[in-house]
Amino acid sequence: LVPYYSMISLMTANPYERGFLGNIQQIFQTLGNVVVNSTFVTLLGIFTSSTETIYTQRAFTITMLIYCIAMILVTFFCVFSTKERVHSAESTDENDKKSANAGREAGTWETVKALLKNKYWVIVTVSSFVVFFIVIMFAMGNVYYCQYVLYDMGQYSWVANSVSIAQFAVMFVTPAFMKKFGKTAVYEAGMVVMGLGFLGFAVFGGSTRIVMIIFNVLKGCGVGMAGGMALGMVADAITYGTKKTGIDTVGLGNAGVSAAQKIGLGLGTAVFGWALNGAGYDGSLDAQGIAQPESVTTMVKFLYNWLPFIMIAIMFVIMIMFYHCERDLKKMEAAE
């Protein structure tokens, strides 16, 4: 992913085009999520070795192997059916200008220091961690919410897909809003919409299916608005840092954001498991037909709704107060 994200920064210096490329990437990523959400539980049911539960090692292993093989095939198709096209500058002046914008190469430690001095890169990196932490919370929480709050695994498909389909749909219109209001405004609006979705589901979730779908659609729209802008904002933040320090941080900058995303996913998964264990979750109770303790239901509700809402609210305040990358980039470009 690091080379892929880096190419978005290198393909064009146009802020709108960067945002548009990031939005397209998110559209197809979301489409993949919809496919997985629609087939995951079905595949577990097909490959389970138990008549009492679908959550067996055999079922998870075979299901994940199928997804991994599909990913490898698609990756090979991408590699062998695409080509980098590099065009040199037509004039010396243009070449000098591009070199100045690209910055100079530096050692690893010097590049790291340049990144840490770039407050906008730090903010988008932290925001990426938060968003991916939240995504894994409700991605894992979908299964547990259906089983231990709704007590009906048949609800899983619409619970998961109401988020993914809304996310997928909204990203077809976000480029228009981005062109009019800018990436930062759309990203922040997405966080507000996402937060309202989590808050509404926390307060009214479980009342009726329609109400839950409405708030899940809000979550999906928020994730789509923020996610569609994220890669473009990373590219802008790296460009800002390069102009400010004169050091090329494209590779390491994108690597840092990618690492933050993976840490968010990994830590979110671990926190979810630790919290459930702390609440008294015991998987063997399901096989015996015994209900989980009430504390488990309470913890699932907190992890699925309240924790994401709290994290979004904090991140939104940070963005509003400290993130002004687009404004500062325009000032720097006007002064050149």
Cite the ranges covered by each PLM segment.
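Residue-level signature of mid-helix packing/kink "hotspots" within the transmembrane helices
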Residues: V34, S164-F172, G266
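Transmembrane alpha-helix termini and helix-breaking/packing motifs in multi-pass membrane transporters
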Residues: N33-Q57, L265-V296
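Intracellular loop-helix junctions on the cytosolic face of multi-pass helical membrane proteins
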Residues: Y4-V143, Q147-M153, V300-L303, P308-E336
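Helix-to-loop junctions at the C-terminal end of transmembrane segments
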Residues: V170-K183
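C-terminal ends and interior cores of transmembrane alpha-helices
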Residues: V193-S207
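Juxtamembrane helix-start elements in MFS-like secondary transporters
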Residues: F60, D152-A160, T208, T297
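Loop-to-transmembrane helix entry/capping segments in MFS-fold secondary transporters
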Residues: P15-I24, M153-G154, G241-A260
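Hydrophobic core of transmembrane alpha-helices in multi-pass small-molecule transporters
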Residues: L1-P3, R209-M229, M233
